[in-house]
Each structure stands twice: as C-alpha cells, then as structure tokens.
UniProtKB/Swiss-Prot annotation:
One Pfam family matching this protein: HCMV_UL124
Protein's recorded name: Uncharacterized protein UL124
Lineage: Viruses, Duplodnaviria, Heunggongvirae, Peploviricota, Herviviricetes
Main localization of the protein described in the UniProt heading: host cell
Membrane topology reported for the UniProt record: Single-pass membrane protein
Length: 152
C-alpha cells in the first residue's frame, strides 16, 4: 500500500511540475488596434505572457499589438486552460487510485475450496481450544455443550 501511495505522490509532483513550467496562457476580452488608423474591433484575444530574458527587468513583456491575432475562443480548453488541466489531473489521479485499489484487493488471495478440503483431509487444521470449565453465561441461562465429531 505504501508503494501505491508513493506512485500517486510522484504522479502529482509530475503534474504540478508540468503546470509550473508551462507558459501562462490567458484569454482576455480586449480591444485590438490592428493598425495605426484607429480602427478597433472588440473580440477575445489569446495572450501569452513571457518573462523577459534579462533578469534586471521587473515587468512582463507582451507581444506587439500588430502581432496579436484577434479571434474568438473555439473550445472549452481554449477558454479555460486551467480548468481543463485540473480536470485532466483529476481523471489521472482517479484512474491511479482505482488501479491501486484493484491491485490491493487482488493481492489478498483466498485459498480455493479444493486447497482447504485437502488441508482438512490431511488433518493439518489447528485444533480448537478447549472450552472453559466455567461458562461466561450468567447463572440463569442454561449452558448447552455440543461436540461435533470429526470423521477422518
């Protein structure tokens, strides 16, 4: 069981590392000025923010307005990338948990009826402990002792 928990932790760490190292994508409603003429169009724009190459710069750099493509979101994953990643992570974790539970249940094998019958016929069963001399029942309750003979 400890091995399964370790695998789940490693999987979660991999997903967290992948989410932290990917570029942050945000879909924002904005007004894009495609040329210097002042013509604007209201739409959604998919903006990628990147850290600048120089470590002395403190602000985030955004792409040029002329390089930004104005488009409408086409799917759920384009509109909500974080929610899509979270749903994918939950699905993967659920599958891993189901597989680990299935392997745990499968590892606890019970002997088949044939094996237990052979063991009983050979007499390798542990004998039952003797009954106590004094019954744990209260005195007003009658005691009934029954011995079941064992045929060999």
């Amino acid at each position: 069981m400890e091995r399964n928990s370790l695998l789940v932790c490693q999987l979660l760490c991999l997903v967290a590392r992948a989410a932290a190292t990917s570029t942050a994508q945000t879909t924002l409603p904005s007004t894009v000025n495609s040329t210097a003429t002042g013509v604007t169009s209201d739409s959604y724009q998919n903006t990628t923010t990147q850290l600048p190459a120089s470590s002395s710069a403190a602000a985030l750099s955004l792409p040029n307005a002329s390089a930004v493509q104005a488009r409408s979101p086409s799917s759920f994953s384009d509109t909500y990338p974080t929610a899509t990643a979270l749903c994918g992570t939950l699905v993967v974790v659920g599958i891993v948990l189901c597989l680990s539970l299935a392997s745990t249940v499968r590892s606890k094998e019970l002997p088949s009826d044939h094996e237990s019958l052979e063991a009983w016929e050979q007499g390798s069963d542990v004998e039952a402990p003797p009954l106590p001399e004094k019954s744990p029942c209260p005195e007003h309750v009658p005691e009934i002792r029954v011995e079941i003979p064992r045929y060999v």
